[in-house]
């Protein structure tokens, strides 16, 4: 008697996936979450430089000038421009009073 006659071979029906026909809400939710995770992962890897640069530098803004007259805004811009002098590749910060 050989070993091949004693081993049961699985029939094709035993290998089929039963998830494809399932309307179980848990399976549907897991599929949606998996697809969204994949999309976000791809977008993150494609655009991470833009996204993190925007988060790092985009949130650092100057003080709000809402309600300030235009003449005072222009004066403030000029003071900010003259506050940093470039001298032989050195930056000098001048505090305004």
UniProtKB/Swiss-Prot annotation:
Protein name: Matrix protein 2
Organism expressing this protein natively: Influenza A virus (strain A/Seal/Massachusetts/1/1980 H7N7)
One GO CC term, this protein: membrane
Residue positions where Phosphoserine is found in the record: 64, 82
Oligomer and partners: Homotetramer; composed of two disulfide-linked dimers held together by non-covalent interactions. May interact with matrix protein 1.
Lineage: Viruses, Riboviria, Orthornavirae, Negarnaviricota, Polyploviricotina
Record family assignment: Belongs to the influenza viruses matrix protein M2 family.
Membrane topology: Single-pass type III membrane protein
Transmembrane regions: 23-43
Cellular compartment(s): Virion membrane; Host apical cell membrane
Region (Disordered): 60-84
Something else known: When the channel is activated, one or more imidazole moieties of His-37 probably become bi-protonated. SC35 was derived from A/Seal/Massachussetts/1/80 (H7N7) by serial passages in chicken embryo cells, thereby acquiring a multibasic cleavage site in its hemagglutinin (HA) and becoming 100% lethal for chickens. SC35 was then passaged 11 times in mouse lung, yielding the mouse-adapted variant SC35M.
Residue(s) at site: Essential for channel activity, possibly by being protonated during channel activation, and by forming the channel gate and the selective filter: 37
InterPro entries documented for this protein: Flu_M2
Pfam family of the protein (one): Flu_M2
Regulation: The M2 protein from most influenza A strains is inhibited by amantadine and rimantadine, resulting in viral uncoating incapacity. Emergence of amantadine-resistant variants is usually rapid.
Record keywords, A-Z: Disulfide bond, Host cell membrane, Host membrane, Host-virus interaction, Hydrogen ion transport, Inhibition of host autophagy by virus, Ion channel, Ion transport, Lipoprotein, Membrane, Palmitate, Phosphoprotein, Signal-anchor, Transmembrane, Transmembrane helix, Transport, Viral ion channel, Virion
